[in-house]
Amino acid sequence: MHLVKSTFVALVAGFFASATFAAGGGGYVEDFDFSFEGPLGTYDQTQLQRGLKVYTEVCSSCHGLKYVPLRTLGDEGGLGYSEEQVRAYAEYYEVYDAELDDYRAAVPSDHFPAVVAAGAPDLSLMAKARAGFHGPYGTGLSQLVNGMGGAEYIASLLTGYTGEEKEEYGSVFYENTAYPGKWIAMAPPLYGEDVDFDDAVSYTHLRAHEPASYLV
């Protein structure tokens, strides 16, 4: 499933379209190499699974994926989880059931729950909003018109924080070289020890690369 592709492409472009920022031009987008680029590209299952882990442990507290069915975690060519693994993951969430008029544990046929903490946008279609290459199922023609795609933008955004901050009108903004206008209201989401992978991969640059893939 394209949406759970890398590690964090999940914090998509449109994702920041609703974030407040100080005026300015377009930001710098690094040309990352993704395995799924171009008509012959393929998805890296391990990368997608890491991306889901980053989303679950870092992003999901503020951002939902309400248009993504949980069952897609078992898609062939995507994350490839077993039915049992998908059911176990689904139970991590609670969803509102209109028939019960109450919340219950999610099942694979449900979608990821919506999360709108602090007005944070849903990530379901964010990467698509700035898509260039659409993985092995697309032609890449969009990139010729729109420049580098959603995965590159998201990975660049996640790694583009400079550490500089400023306060305007009672709000704190963070300098980010990839964000249009250079100043974004979202604090850096990735730190050195925020996610532990089974294979000991924990570098911010790689973790940003993977979520980006995951969401495309």
Give, region by region, the residue ranges found by the protein language model.
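Post-cleavage N-terminal segment of exported redox proteins
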Residues: H2-T7, V12-T42
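Acidic/histidine-rich catalytic neighborhood
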Residues: G38, V68-P69, Y81-A106
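Sequence/structural segment immediately N-terminal to covalent heme-attachment motifs in c-type
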Residues: Y43-L65
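Detector for the c-type heme attachment site
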Residues: H63-V68, K128, A187
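Short cysteine/histidine-rich zinc-coordinating motifs and their immediately flanking basic loops
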Residues: R71-E76
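Membrane-proximal low-complexity regions enriched in glycine and acidic/polar residues
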Residues: Y93-P180
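Mobile gating loops/cap/lid regions near enzyme active sites that modulate substrate access
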Residues: T177-L190
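Conserved small/polar residues in nucleotide/adenosyl-binding loops
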Residues: T204-P211
